[in-house]
Amino acid sequence: MLKRQSAPLGTWLMSASASTAEALGYAGFDWLLVDMEHVPIEFRDLWHILQAIQCTGAQPIVRVAANDPVLLKRALDLGSTNVMVPFVENAEQARAAVSAVKYPPMGTRGFAAVHRASRYGTWKGYGQQANDSVSCILQIETATALANLEEIAAVPGVDALFLGPGDLSSVCGHIGNPAHPDIQAMISDAIVRCKAIGMPIGIVGGTPELVGSYLEQGYAFAAVASDMAMMMSKANELLVALKGRQAPEAVATAY
């Protein structure tokens, strides 16, 4: 996913719906993030969602609920080619995430021969090729993580970073307000530092204008909104037009 020439554009999947995932893939998004951190998506759901996404040409990213080797192993065994790990704050945690994603000798991922990722055992070289065919993306979501950005990025096997404006604004005392000047300054600082070390970094924003500004700064890939945010926005637009009611003020700033 990270080798595309133009900045890949994605969105968040919060609905646990394979049909929605498939539709958004056909809509033209380059990648779709399945959020298992904030949504009660089970691994059986993930199985069907990945099948739906991979029919469309979009790339799946699975954000697991925690930096846990079992959760990462199951997402990879189900066939996700990209995983995102939340709340990584230092090099030790980064090494743990990479280890869980990679087979020995690079890591400690448990091996099974027959699962969806190996095409149920028909991909004879899967075990040898898997370490090069999956991406490990680590989330930078706190001031501590930002302070340790270079040491996190320097861990072998880290393919990209992803800045989380929502949690960053929350832990820095500006909950629900990633547009605060202090947070925007951190966002700008992160891309400058990532450019300096050659590490791709992504980000999420709630509007095309905001996402466009991030891409202009040099963010390598970005997500805009989410399936649920898009549905609520369109529903409100239709109800305002047809019923003349005042649309409720949106509280979500990204997804």
Curated annotation (Swiss-Prot):
Q: What induces it?
A: Is highly up-regulated during growth on sulfoquinovose, compared to growth on glucose or succinate (at protein level).
Residues with site note (Transition state stabilizer):
R63
Q: Which residues form the active site?
A: H38 (proton acceptor)
Q: Name one GO cellular component term.
A: cytoplasm
The protein's required cofactors:
a divalent metal cation
Q: Which InterPro entries match?
A: Aldolase/citrate-lyase_domain, HpcH-HpaI_aldolase, Pyrv/PenolPyrv_kinase-like_dom, Pyrv_kinase-like_dom_sf
- Co-factor binding details: Binds 1 divalent metal cation per subunit.
Known catalytic reactions? 2-dehydro-3,6-dideoxy-6-sulfo-D-gluconate = (2S)-3-sulfolactaldehyde + pyruvate
**EC number of the protein:** 4.1.2.58
Q: Residues at site: Increases basicity of active site His?
A: D77
Q: Which UniProt keywords apply?
A: Lyase, Metal-binding
Recorded GO molecular functions are: aldehyde-lyase activity; metal ion binding
Residue sites binding a divalent metal cation per the record: E141, D167
Stored Pfam families: HpcH_HpaI
Quote the function comment for this protein.
Answer: Catalyzes the retro-aldol cleavage of 2-dehydro-3,6-dideoxy-6-sulfo-D-gluconate to (2S)-3-sulfolactaldehyde and pyruvate. Is involved in a degradation pathway of sulfoquinovose (SQ) that allows P.putida SQ1 to use SQ as the sole carbon and energy source for growth.
Family membership: Belongs to the HpcH/HpaI aldolase family.
* UniProt subunit comment: Homohexamer; trimer of dimers.
Annotated protein name in UniProt:
2-dehydro-3,6-dideoxy-6-sulfogluconate aldolase
Source organism per UniProt: Pseudomonas putida (Arthrobacter siderocapsulatus)
